[in-house]
Amino acid sequence: MKNPLLRPWLTEKSTGLTEKKGQYVFKVKLDADKTDIKKAIEEKFGVVVKSVRTVNCLGKSKRQFTRKGVLQGKKSDWKKAIVTLAKDQSIDYYSGSTQKGEG
């Protein structure tokens, strides 16, 4: 697989995971597996990945009421990966580089 990483998933919950546990959340391709994700993060950011957990998220169904009737559709399914790094390592999302922690 070329690059399974799509983008960092920056939410209030994922930011809390980063601050408290040193875990980072990424949106990844649906067909990506844990080993591909681990290799991609280690190559791109130059860090040591301790573990990878993945979550398959189902897309929501949507309805729109119009004069001609009800239009039904569905948002796309997606997948996110929760990545735990080795101690004293971090990822800077904006520059694509890593920083060593003090301690």
From Swiss-Prot:
GO biological process, any: translation
InterPro entries according to UniProt: Nucleotide-bd_a/b_plait_sf (IPR012677), Ribosomal_uL23-like (IPR013025), Ribosomal_uL23/eL15/eS24_sf (IPR012678)
Family: Belongs to the universal ribosomal protein uL23 family.
Matches recorded under NCBIfam families: PRK05738.2-4 (NF004363)
Organism: Chlorobium phaeobacteroides (strain DSM 266 / SMG 266 / 2430)
Record's GO cellular component terms: ribonucleoprotein complex; ribosome
Role, per record: One of the early assembly proteins it binds 23S rRNA. One of the proteins that surrounds the polypeptide exit tunnel on the outside of the ribosome. Forms the main docking site for trigger factor binding to the ribosome.
UniProt protein name: Large ribosomal subunit protein uL23
SUPFAM superfamilies: Ribosomal proteins S24e, L23 and L15e (SSF54189)
Subunit structure: Part of the 50S ribosomal subunit. Contacts protein L29, and trigger factor when it is bound to the ribosome.
Entry keyword set: Ribonucleoprotein, Ribosomal protein, RNA-binding, rRNA-binding
Annotated Pfam families: Ribosomal_L23
MF GO annotations: rRNA binding; structural constituent of ribosome
Disulfide bonds: none
Superkingdom of this protein's organism: Bacteria
